From Swiss-Prot:
Biased composition (Polar residues): 1-14, 986-1007, 1087-1103
Name assigned to this protein: Nuclear matrix constituent protein 1
Annotated Gene Ontology cellular component terms: nuclear lamina; nuclear matrix
Residue stretches spanning the membrane: none
Higher taxonomy: Eukaryota, Viridiplantae, Streptophyta, Embryophyta, Tracheophyta
Biased composition annotated in UniProt, kind: Low complexity: 892-904, 1173-1186
Regions of compositional bias (Basic residues) in chain numbering: 947-960
Amino acid sequence: MLTPQRSAWSLKSKVSSEKPRSKGKGITKNLDSAATPFPPLGLLNGGDLDRGGEDMEAWKRFKDEGLLDESICYKKDRESLASRIIELEKDLHEYQYNMGLLLIEKKEWSSHFEEMKMRLAEAEEILKREQAAHIIALTESEKREDNLRKALGVEKQCVTDLEKALREMRSEIAEVKYTAEKKMTEAFALEASIEEKRLDTERKLHSADAKLAEASRKSSEINRKLEDVEDRERKVQRELNSINSERKALEKDISEQKEHLREWEKKLQDGQNRLLDGQRHINEREERINEAEGGLKKKEEELEEAKRSIEGTRNTLKRKEEDLDVRLRSLVSKEKEIELKMKNLQKKEKDLHEIAEKLDHREREEIQKLLDEHRATLDTKKREFELELESKRKSVDEELKSKFAAVNKAEKEVNRKQGLISEGEKELESKMDKIKIKEKDLETKSKALKKWEESLKSDEKKLVAEKDQIMKDTHELKVSINELESLRDALNAEQHQIAEEREKLEISKEEREQYIQKQSELKQEIEKYRNMQEELSKGIESLREEREKFEKEWESLDEKKITLQRETKKIHEEKEKLEKWHHKDQERLRNEEANAKADIERQLEDIKLQKEAFENTMKHERLMAQEEVARRLADVTRELELRKHDLEMNMQKKQEEIERKLQGKEREFETRKEAELSRITSLINLNNSKLQKLRIEQDRLDREKEEVELQKKKLQEDQSEIQRDVDTLRQLSKNLKNQRAEFIKEKECFLAAAERCKTCQNCGVSISELEMVGIIQSSAEIENADIVLPSLTDDHIEQHMKNKGSHVTSPQTGSRVFGSGFLQKCTKIFKFSPGKNAETSATTTPLVFGEELDIAASEDAAANDNNPAADVERVTVNPSLVFGEQLDTAASEDAAANDNNPAADVERVTVNPPPLAPVATEQNETEESSLPPENDSPPKQRGGRQSTRRGRGGKTVRRTRTMEAVVDDAKAILGDTLIVEEAKESSQQNDEQSQGASVHTGGTSNTRQKRRRAPASEMTNSEHDVEESESQSQSISIGRGRRKKRQTSAASEVQAPVVERRYNLRHSTVAKNSVAATLAVSDQAKVQTKASHQASHDNNQISMGDDPALEGSHKVTHTVQKTTTASVMEVSSKPAMEETHEENIVVRSVEISEMSASEEAEGEVQGVPPIAEEPATPSSGSSTSGDIGNDDDMDDDDEEERHNASIGKKLWNFFTT
């Protein structure tokens, strides 16, 4: 079958190409073939073989003697090599020709197979026709039997029943087929989906690797941007979140894929179970069919017995039987042919099954490997995502291990092949020279082989798909064969039934009744049978369609097989040259041996056809062919050895390079991993530290917020209390306005008394008319003045709260709070003596009574705030000409009581001026007069001073008011504009509570208090504004000393107007403009006369220096007795807790800012009235302790209170009731 016809070959070429091969070496062989003449053609016809042998021997001798030239031999060698190459090319063409023949034979076999299919189809059609004819015959016989004895009706029913049963069976079989096909398609679809999912998983893994690379890149960028800590933390958190989310998403995808795979495996198992169940159902149905056939056989026996009774129908039945016998014989002959064809088909199917089983086995192994690999990769990826960098190292190790395993396997295969190849090493050593020449050709062929291998890989994938299709086709063929066998069995059964029915027709008359009874059953069975036949016909049609499809697919498969066979043959040829590539070289050698044998057989056949004489020559040719095969094998083995050696070297080099690269990558990976881990740990530590700091700050802020809320609550309460106080003040002002008439009346009485007592009873000094004029003017101004209601402004409160802060008063200062101080100062204002009414009216500027109340209330409110502003008291002294002789105590006390400025109550003031710079401008002077908050004396000194005044506590109503209540009242009136700096209170509270104000009454060393100069740079604008406003306000001296002063009318006329001052919680907007508005031209003239009068007395008095900085530098304390300059004494103090006296003496550092007599002309200070200091005698002011509240002062106070009982008690009773 496989021997091609080679008519184109000539005997001459064979003899010429093979005859010289009997020599040992290829070169001599070629030289012999080229140099020696060919034997004559006559030898072929005759038997002169000996002559040819003699000629050969002669040529050999000639050659051995060395008569040939070397150049000719070299040329002949080259020609022989070229001829050898040509011969090899011819061999290749021959091999290709053989491949073409094989393909042609394959086509022939495929055509033969198609013919067999066509024959089968024709046989099936004949069978169908015969079945139809048989059914027609049966119907005809039934009709005749109905016409004769109505017996054939029962047979028809039986046939219909049988047909129905068959139809049901066929329908069930078709359904089972359809379900099986669906399941197979689903299985293939699932396989495709699994592959797609695998690809998706690989893509996702690549994307995950890319994302990991991106994460590393981002981490590097984060390490570069170490400047902004917050941005770095956010980026790190975002990256961590993204990585976690990606990891979770990948884990979810992997879990879903695992679930899909598990579901797919479950579905496959379910499909297999269903197929098994379907097969079981088919087997059960076949058993049922067999049982039905047994029942039918019984019924047929009964029918035969009934037929025996029918004698009239025997002849017709015999004729029909003969016809049926003839047809059955033809069917049997056709069935035998079909069986032969089926056997052939079965053989081919077995071959296909074997191939399919091999392919299935390989596919299963590959699929299992793929599944194992995928599972391993999935597990490794999980671990990688969970363990991050550590898992990467493990995965790299696993990959390296797998690669090393693959390399080891390849090495084992190479070693195995080396063992096989080492056997032919001895034979291949002799042909090294030829192989060197062929190395170039082999290199080109190796490149082609690589290309072929790549094409083979793609073809193998195609083969896998085609194998699947072949498996499907084989399965369908099996099903169709089984159906044909079942049809054949059914036909045999039907034949047996017909024969039995014929026998049963000969039943005796006794059994006719039973036959009639069973005819109905037989009719039903016949109907079933007809149904079965219809189903069979449908199944046959479906089988035809399937056969057509199968034929089409088979044709496509044949075409693919042809192409694949071509490619496989080419692959086999190349594999025969190289055993390393899956034993391709061994197959090539086998094909060459087979080709050599085929050539020998062809030659033998040609020689046998031509002559028997060529048997000897054919034997010789066979020997030559064997030698050629051996030589070729030796050449191939030599080539294989060289190629193997080269490949081994290349593999070793590649392995070394791969190992080096892997080691370098591992080192880089470890270094990067360590660097990233260190960076991540550093970032984590930084983040943790920052988080801890942020938590601490957050806790601190929460605490501060709580404190602020508490302070806000306190402030609200203080605002409410302030509002209440304001309401009370307004009510008091209204009451005072109503009582002004009474006061005017009393004042008129006082003026009348003053006119009577123009001369002092104690000292005999007469009161000048100028002082009386001042008293009259002051009384007129008081009558004409309107009482202005106290009011609050937002600006003052805001500035006050910003500069001073809101502090709770200490327990020591709690007794002297807002209500008590205010009432005391009100009593001081309204204590007028009849003797001094005219002097006060002449010396003081027109001051509204309500404004004095506001001033007193503001000072008490400032004292209640427990801030430095509460400890600053301004002692304003009305300037007057002090005479050498002192008035008596009663007259001086009355004059002090009638004075509107309560600062005149200070008897002796010890001044310790601050070390301030000289006054240059109005602004500098106002700045020098102000003090920072931290320069005040502690509140303990005030407590000591208050303890000396408790003797008069019964005559005053003291209201305990806290700073919180005052602030709450102010906030309730002003709204939420009050800004309280609560954060500064905790740091300033202890310092500010320890601050107080004290007055130095003596220049001795008992005070022992250092004077600290506050630099001008420490003073803020807010402090300057507050102290400037306080310098304009009139505060009342706390210490009640001896009031032994005499004020002349000239001095009172020269006095500048007192700045109007409202409640201390706001700035006074009228203060700066009130001086210019209240001064008259006549007053200015009087001021000039006063200045000249004061200049004459400056030599006799120890007065304050105009340069406060000079006085502060020397720290000289002056006892002021007489002065003619207007000055404003600002009382302030610095905290000097370590230098306070042990006797708890109240010390007030008085800061005096002086103005010269030329103040009116120059206008350096606006809003500050020039006030003369009080004269003090040495006998009354020689105490060095500076304590104002001593026993002498208390006695003088008691005398004053008894003397002023006529007016003071009334006013006091008015304010206290």
